[in-house]
Amino acid sequence: MSNRITFAVVTVATLVGGAVLWQIHNQKEIPRAAAAVTVAAPAPPVRTEERKEHDDGESREMAARAIEATKRPVDTKKTAAVADAGSPLRAGETWQYSAIVSMLSSVANLRLKVAEKRNFLGKNAWHLQAFAHTENPFRMVFALDDQFDSYSDAATLVSMQYEMHLNEKGQTVDSVQRMSPAVREAAPADTIAARVLPGTRDPLGMMQYLRTVDWAKTPEVRSPVYDGHKLYDVHARLQGRGEPVTVPAGSFNTFKIELQVLDNAVEMKDAHFILYLSNTEARLPVLLEAVMPFATARVELLKAE
């Protein structure tokens, strides 16, 4: 799977629904071990290192694939800024989404959840989750049941640990990556140390971070985002305020946010993302539009709890 497709899969799946969107067109067979740690060069300064061997040969293959990059394409200035003091995150929040591709009916469903605020590695952290599943009839040809877990700093939503538990077409991959800006910080057993830039967020943390931004005062934010494979630079820009949006969950006035994704300082031209956040204190992610060369996708909010 190409790096661009990998990012789109994780972004669409974990931000607002349906890892299937890019895989419909581009899915290839992925070795179980490779999927957990692949970082293609040239890349931003991310490296993954296996600190301890797993009980099977897969972990040794993971370690063999670990690489260290040398370029620094992202501007990390203020990327770890403290989230809005009036953060809208609440423990137990859950959102249900449906992913629609072009003229097809729902091909996947997604559930996002703010599971809890807890102590993690001695710090206050949010435990964020996403669950993606394909639906019939597409499920008959591509069965997908994925879960993503993020432990993100409660103040900044900077990633501390990112987990991918993938089950796609009967093939399973489990990856637990500890975010580590420090060069020699050890990772515990069954965990990979991912060397990332300070202030790096994972896709789940980035989604929630966008909710904390006061878009009436801040027209643009930037952040490095690590998707479990590679580091990207994400620029989020306010494109409109009071945009009317209707989805199954209801009608909303929204902030229209353009998401620009840069791979090694070069903008990804083959995908264009627009995120709509409700113009309320909750700033609910109500709709994502993804325009791709082969299809247009809408990920719509079905229900918020």
Predicted regions located by residue number:
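Membrane interfacial helix-start segments of signal peptides and signal-anchor transmembrane helices
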Residues: 1-12
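Acidic, serine/threonine-rich low-complexity disordered tracts
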Residues: 7, 15-179, 215-305
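Active-site/ligand-binding surface loops and adjacent short beta/alpha elements
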Residues: 179-226
